[in-house]
């Protein structure tokens, strides 16, 4: 990868073998976005497409009526200078003046990666993996600087963030500060977003961009199940394999805002960053503020190409630590099998049964701590319930491990119950208005993580449970969103900082704990996939994808999640039937087929399984272990879309290309059966592949071009799985 600067024409060119990103300095002041896309050798600097004398446009350079900021393709636009589209940043001084004039004031080209302070980001293992461009914008009147950071890698990705520095003598308030802005010259795109609801996360929405705007956002305190900080721009007709795709994703776990805004002259503006709603940051003299990092991915190979870039980047350069490259264990979670009805005897019986089936990790979910028999009490009091565990938690963990199985535990550290010792001792640690009774959700309140004392308490409380070393896994949950925004810790002028400071506090807590316990596998959760984002993956390398364990619903949820996140980050469980969320009954084989497309787990009462079902589960687990490396670290391809069809299908190709796992799920059986033809992807067309079960041989070109015909099965929710070996 390289970054060049052409002095005469003031052109920056970031490029590698796959992509180019071009920026030009206009009028010695303004940054113009020129190009982001397939690699080009040079940019013709004479292009002046947007220089016209247009009526009703402001002219910042009085003698040039052809130049207006409202018509230009901008890189990081301000407000108040005649560009009436959405700005990337805004401020307000102590006199209420919101005007600012940041102009270009220099650059640096650096080897390696510059990281945003205190925030998750794409990292590098060596400086040779990346190059970074730092561009300085300065308001000399206010004595303020904004540094724009662009990092390019070997893959088709660029990361961006911005840093605001107050060099003046007076404080200012940052009212809006986005991570990225990019203006594009045409509106000929489809827009792809991932939205949904609790237990219906990451639904795929695609629509043509018209002469209006598309906005995505969360103001819930987290990235949320209702929205995802992602925007995809697709050239018309783009498919999984073909077409241009520009994908933008934010590495952040809090409130976010994104938009695709249509301009009056056929251009568009793409933005992503912290949601300016209820946001403000007091920037004192001599201090700075960093935005979260945005990831920009470009693909000429359709949606699959975009996903593969995100998958490689997030698995190897966002996920970190001991488990980054290690296979994840097959687990049994106690929640749907027992709910709050747990004790030492039941857990030991469960451990023995689980070990006999080949399960490697027993996770004790909610209900283990002092007085926790319902969801109305005890959050915050992270000590074991002596009535349920008279010999203590560590004794239980040791006994479980003696049965040949690891032990994990559930926490919800960010929450507090009114009926708890912690609340009685520290009622001021709760996020709430000083005027009103706080609103409950799931009978619980949210701890104020902007307060360092709260963060230290959480680190200490979780550490006391983990220090003895018998617990190898933590499920970190968050089962409500933020309301009644108010902090007893923050000053009045800093109250609008609360939502962002909450996220910064959370990141600091997780950074400390994951460094302190590097061999504990942390899995994040927020009532399922309510905080499934790249920010959380920086600290916890896998996420519980959804609280909805129905395999038919999971087809869509996991399909949508796969646009950004690799299979090894997705928790997926086989649960009981009828399903506890929707009441549907589905075959055990199909439940396994869907769950086996992620980190496999089981979430049911093993005692209720019939003898033949236990035999089937034992065989499932053995089969998954045989192919686990391929599932978790292979390249994933979507083949059929259950949002559009009565089926879903995918295949995964191992890292070395020697193994292929193909899965097809029929949703509803039909009398007038249409034989599905599914074309596999990512194979070697010149190779021969052998079906490991039947011995049948296929050509790679046959599987990819002619495809596989799925025979008729007269049963709803049926599945077919084929494991192929390359000869």
What annotation goes with each model-predicted range?
Residues 70, 75, 80-113, 240-254, ...:
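Glycine-rich, aromatic-flanked loop segments that form ligand/cofactor-binding clefts
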Residues 323-460, 473:
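Aromatic-lined carbohydrate-binding/catalytic grooves of carbohydrate-active enzymes
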Residues 668-727:
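C-terminal beta-sandwich/jelly-roll accessory domains of carbohydrate-active enzymes
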Residues 417, 422-456, 500-607:
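Glycan-recognition surfaces
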Residues 97-104, 281-300, 718-725:
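Short Pro-Gly-centered flexible turn/kink motifs
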Residues 231, 642-684:
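Carbohydrate-binding surface patches
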Residues 5, 9-13, 17, 31-261, ...:
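Polysaccharide-binding surfaces and accessory modules of carbohydrate-active proteins
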Residues 18, 162, 286, 332, ...:
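Conserved, mostly hydrophobic/aromatic
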């Amino acid at each position: 990868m390289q970054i060049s600067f052409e002095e005469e024409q003031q052109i920056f060119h970031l490029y590698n073998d796959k992509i180019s990103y071009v920026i030009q300095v206009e009028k010695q002041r303004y940054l113009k976005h020129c190009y982001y896309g397939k690699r080009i050798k040079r940019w013709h600097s004479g292009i002046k497409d947007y220089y016209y004398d247009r009526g009703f446009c402001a002219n910042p350079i009085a003698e040039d009526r052809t130049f207006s900021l409202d018509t230009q393709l901008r890189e990081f636009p301000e407000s108040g200078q005649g560009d009436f589209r959405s700005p990337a940043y805004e401020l307000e001084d102590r006199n209420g003046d919101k005007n600012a004039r940041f102009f270009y004031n220099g650059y640096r080209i650096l080897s390696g990666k510059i990281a945003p302070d205190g925030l998750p980001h794409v990292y590098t293992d060596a400086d040779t993996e990346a190059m970074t461009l730092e561009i300085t914008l300065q308001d000399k009147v206010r004595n303020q600087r904004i540094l724009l950071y662009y990092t390019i890698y070997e893959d088709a990705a660029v990361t961006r963030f911005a840093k605001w520095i107050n060099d003046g003598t007076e404080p200012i308030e940052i009212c809006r500060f986005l991570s990225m802005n990019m203006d594009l010259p045409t509106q000929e795109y489809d827009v792809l977003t991932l939205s949904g609801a609790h237990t219906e996360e990451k639904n795929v929405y695609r629509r043509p961009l018209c002469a209006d705007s598309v906005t995505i956002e969360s103001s819930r305190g987290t990235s949320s199940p209702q929205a995802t900080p992602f925007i995809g721009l697709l050239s018309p007709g783009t498919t999984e394999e073909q077409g241009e795709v520009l994908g933008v994703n934010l590495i952040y776990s809090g409130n976010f805002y994104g938009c695709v805004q249509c301009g009056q002259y056929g251009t568009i503006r793409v933005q992503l960053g912290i949601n300016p709603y209820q946001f403000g940051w007091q920037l004192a003299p001599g201090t700075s503020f960093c935005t979260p990092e945005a990831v920009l991915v470009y693909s000429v190979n359709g949606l699959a190409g975009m996903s593969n870039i995100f998958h490689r980047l997030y698995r190897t350069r966002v996920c970190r630590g001991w488990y980054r490259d290690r296979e994840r264990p097959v687990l049994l979670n106690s929640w749907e099998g027992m709910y709050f009805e747990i004790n030492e005897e039941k857990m030991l019986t469960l451990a023995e049964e689980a070990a006999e089936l080949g399960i490697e990790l027993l996770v004790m979910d909610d209900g283990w701590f002092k007085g926790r028999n319902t969801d109305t009490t005890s959050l915050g009091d992270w000590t074991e319930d002596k009535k349920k565990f008279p010999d203590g938690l560590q004794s239980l963990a040791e006994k479980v491990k003696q049965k040949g199985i690891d032990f994990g535990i559930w926490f919800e550290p960010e929450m507090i119950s009114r009926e708890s010792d912690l609340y009685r001792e520290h009622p001021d640690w709760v996020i709430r208005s000083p005027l009103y009774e706080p609103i409950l959700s799931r009978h619980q309140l949210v701890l104020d993580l902007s307060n360092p004392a709260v963060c230290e308490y959480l680190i200490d409380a979780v550490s006391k449970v983990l220090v003895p070393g018998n617990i190898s896994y933590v499920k970190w949950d968050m089962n409500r969103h933020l309301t009644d925004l108010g902090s007893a810790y923050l000053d009045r002028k800093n109250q609008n900082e609360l939502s962002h400071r909450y996220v910064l506090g959370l990141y600091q807590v997780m950074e400390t704990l994951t460094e302190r316990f590097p061999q504990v596998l942390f899995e994040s959760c927020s009532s399922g996939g309510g905080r499934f984002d790249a920010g959380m993956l920086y600290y916890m390398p896998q996420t519980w994808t959804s609280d909805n364990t129905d395999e038919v619903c999971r087809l869509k949820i996991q399909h949508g999640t796969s646009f950004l996140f690799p299979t090894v980050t997705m928790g997926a469980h086989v649960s009981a039937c009828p399903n506890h969320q929707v009441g549907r009954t589905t075959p055990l084989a199909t439940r396994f087929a869907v769950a086996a497309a992620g980190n496999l787990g089981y979430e049911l009462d093993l005692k209720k399984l019939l003898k033949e079902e236990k035999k089937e589960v034992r065989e499932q687990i053995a089969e998954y272990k045989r192919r686990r490396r391929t599932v978790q670290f292979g390249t994933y391809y979507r083949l059929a879309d259950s949002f559009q069809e009565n089926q879903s299908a995918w295949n995964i190709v191992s890292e070395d290309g020697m193994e292929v796992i193909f899965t097809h799920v029929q949703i509803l059986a039909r009398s007038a059966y249409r034989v599905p033809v599914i074309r596999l992807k990512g194979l070697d067309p010149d190779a021969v592949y052998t079906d490991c079960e039947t011995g049948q041989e296929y050509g790679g070109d046959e599987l990819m071009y002619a495809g596989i015909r799925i025979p008729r099965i007269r049963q709803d929710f049926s599945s077919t799985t084929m494991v192929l070996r390359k000869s």
